[in-house]
Regions:
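Phosphate-binding site of ATP-dependent enzymes
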Residues: 164-246, 256-257, 261-263
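Glycine-/Pro-rich loop/turn segments that contact NAD(P) or position catalytic residues
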Residues: 101, 105, 113-137
Length: 323
C-alpha cells in the first residue's frame, strides 16, 4: 500500500536532533522532495525543531485535542508518516491509528493491545515469558526478598526506580503506592551486562532486523556510551522474537545478560534515545520505514550491521538568532 502523502512528522522532537537528521538523510535519497517536519510544545526551544525542515507547536499530550491537532496538522502538511518518540503519547496514538490510516497517514505505532502491554511492566514480563525469555521475579509486597528493586509499573527512563537493600529502606509511601512493583534485584554493576536492542518489525509483525547495543554508560536514563554486539542475545532474539503480534516499526527492548542467562526487562514500542548508534551501524530503520509505508515495498531481513561499533556521545549546540 502506497500513499500520495510523502512528508514525515516527528512528534515531541525535543532534543532528538540525530533522529531528525537520520530521517532527513534517508528522505534525501528519494526524488519526491520529502520533508521531515517536527512538533513540540515549544518548538522555539527545541533543538530538533530548529534542525527539522519545519516545526509546529502542538498542545500538551494530556490535552483532549492533542490527537485532533496532530491529525489536522498531518492533513495540512501532506504527512504520510508519523514517528512517535515518547512513552506518554503512545497509547493515544495507537488508539487513533485507524483514523489516520483511513486518511492515508501512517503512524508508526504498534497495535493498541501491545502498547498497553508494553506500558505496564507486569504485562511486559508475561509477554517475555510467552516468548520463552526469563524475567526478574515480581514479589508480592507482603512477602519481599531483599535486596530487591522498586519501580513504577508504568515508569520510564528509570524515573522513580530505587534499589532496596533491606526492609529499613522501605517507606510507608512506597509500600502504599499501587504503582510501585518490587522485583528481584539483578546486579548490573558487578555481574550482569545491560543491553538495549533496536528491533525492526514490518507491518505484519515479522522481525526484519535486531541490533543489540551494550549500554557502557548512561546519563539521565539515556545511553551516552554504547557499542553494538553480535552475541548470544542476538541469536536468542532472532529465534524467540521473530514474530511479535501487533508490533510495527522500531521496538526498543531492554535485557540484562550474563553468559547464557538472559532477563527481559522492558519493551518500548518507539525509537529509543540510543538509536543513532544502530543507524550508524547499518540498521537503516528510517529508510525502511519510508520504503515500506510511503512506497509499499517489502523489507527483507537484514543482519549485515557493523559489530563492535562504539558510540561516544558529547554535548552539541544549536544556535538560534532571535529577531
Amino acid at each position: 500500500m502506497t500513499t500520495n502523502k510523502k512528508n514525515i512528522l516527528i512528534l515531541s522532537a525535543g532534543r532528538r536532533v540525530e533522529l531528525v537528521q537520520d530521517f532527513q538523510a534517508e528522505a534525501a535519497k528519494f526524488s519526491d522532495g520529502i520533508k521531515v517536519l517536527a512538533t513540540d510544545l515549544n518548538p522555539r526551544m527545541s533543538p530538533a525543531c530548529h534542525v527539522a525542515d519545519g516545526a509546529f507547536s502542538v498542545p500538551p499530550i494530556s490535552a483532549e485535542n492533542y490527537i485532533d491537532s496532530i491529525f489536522d496538522l498531518a492533513l495540512e502538511q501532506n504527512i504520510g508518516l508519523i514517528i512517535p518518540t515518547i512513552d506518554t503519547e503512545l497509547q493515544k496514538l495507537a488508539d487513533a491509528r485507524r483514523r489516520f490510516e483511513e486518511a492515508g497517514i501512517h503512524i508508526i505505532i504498534s497495535d493498541s493491545e501491545l502498547v498497553t502491554i508494553c506500558r505496564d511492566k507486569r504485562f511486559t514480563a508475561s509477554l517475555f515469558n510467552r516468548c520463552d525469555i526469563a524475567t526478574p521475579e515480581i514479589y508480592e509486597r507482603e512477602n519481599l526478598t531483599f535486596p530487591c528493586f522498586a519501580k513504577p509499573y508504568d515508569g520510564s527512563r528509570s524515573i522513580g526506580a530505587k534499589y532496596i537493600h533491606t526492609a529499613e529502606d522501605l517507606s510507608y509511601d512506597m509500600l502504599k503506592d499501587p504503582k510501585i512493583i518490587f522485583c528481584q534485584y539483578i546486579d548490573i554493576t558487578n555481574e550482569f551486562t545491560e543491553f538495549t536492542v533496536d528491533l525492526y518489525y514490518d507491518r505484519s509483525g515479522r522481525l526484519k532486523c535486531a541490533v543489540p547495543r551494550e549500554r557502557l554508560e548512561v546519563r539521565t536514563g539515556e545511553v551516552s556510551k554504547g557499542a553494538t554486539r553480535r552475541n548470544g542475545l542476538y541469536t536468542l532474539l532472532i529465534d524467540k522474537m521473530s514474530h511479535l503480534e501487533g508490533a510495527r516499526g522500531c521496538i526498543t527492548a531492554q535485557f540484562f545478560c550474563k553468559g547464557s542467562t538472559v532477563y527481559g526487562i522492558e519493551i518500548n514500542p518507539r525509537f529509543g534515545g540510543g538509536f543513532p548508534l544502530t543507524y550508524a551501524a547499518g540498521g537503516n530503520y528510517p529508510g525502511w520505514l519510508i520504503r515500506e509505508y510511503l512506497y509499499g515495498e517489502k523489507i527483507p531481513f537484514f543482519d549485515e550491521w557493523e559489530n563492535n561499533l562504539i558510540m561516544l556521545r558529547y554535548d552539541a549546540k544549536v544556535l538560534v538568532h532571535e529577531k
